Amino acid sequence: MVNSLSRILFCSLLIFSVISLREERLETAPITDDPWDLDGPCQKYVEKLAVVQSEMVACATNWSIPPVVCTKCFQNYINFKQFEYETKNLNNVYSLDNRTCSQVIYDNYLLSYSTDISKALTSEIWEKSRCDSCITIKWNFPQNKSEVSFSERTMQFQNRMYEWRNCVVNYTSGGVLDDNLTNGSKICNLCKTTFDELFGYYWKIYTTPDVDFCVDVETTMNDTIHLWDDVWKCAEKQDRNRDLFGIMITFGTLLLLTALFYAASYIQGGGETRRLIQYARLSDPHGQRSRLLSSGMSDADLVSRVSPGSSVLYNVPIHQTR
């Protein structure tokens, strides 16, 4: 029985070793073993580029509600741009037809999926999110030591956001979505100061010309306002009444200005209604003037109407008297 167990164990170990060796060979086998793969030496670089691109896509998708890709995915973006730089400088690695791998990846074919995906990640995600307004990346591709720094206004916003959230957590014992968070409750009163400071700072930056926040800050602030006003009902009725009163004052002012405008126009006109001339009822013009103004009369016709014995001379063009 001991021999049987030994054989079974030995066979199991042998099978496991064969499977492991096969998987290891598949993972480490050079792509150039395929004689039909013209670009075999470049394939491993494309595979690694695909990995960093997919990691950036996954991070952006995971942090898309709300979109906070700038503050959550900056390291993935750096990794992606770093290896993109490396693939564009593969000048010492060649395909089987002696083209550099950089040419193979980016210039060798009618379509370059690597280029299209890289452009989409850069322009459609990073740049459209205005990440440069919140984050500054000091690129150092040759040394692979790029550094990240957050802008001062972004840090100030995050600090105020943390202060407000800490206030909410402290008074709710960690249960942020507490049933008692209704209008007039303690949390709305105790954390109103920190919320007003947060919103005041955001609004100051938002209304400053030529100064932008990244999308991360804008969407985070919008969600915070909805949470405070609509979910927790912390918006004061006095604030809402003040807004309604302001709208009514504006509307009343517009009506008053319109009435004054028409009153001033009536007074300047002497209080009389304007008389409109109906040209359709006027009689047709008569006499010699109508004949002179007739569009069908030429200079030659005018001369022919003068009697032969008349002493009146007309300056008629030569080409019309011949």
Curated annotation (Swiss-Prot):
Gene Ontology CC, one term: membrane
InterPro entries recorded: Osteopetrosis-assoc_TM_1
Glycan-bearing residues: N62, N98, N144, N170, N180, N183, N222
GO BP, one annotated term: lysosome organization
Pfam families (alphabetical): OSTMP1
Bilayer disposition of the protein: Single-pass membrane protein
Coiled-coil residues: none
Role summary: Modulates the transport of substances from the endosomal to lysosomal compartments. Plays a role in lysosome formation and function in coelomocytes.
Protein name in UniProt: Coelomocyte uptake defective protein 15
Organism of provenance: Caenorhabditis elegans
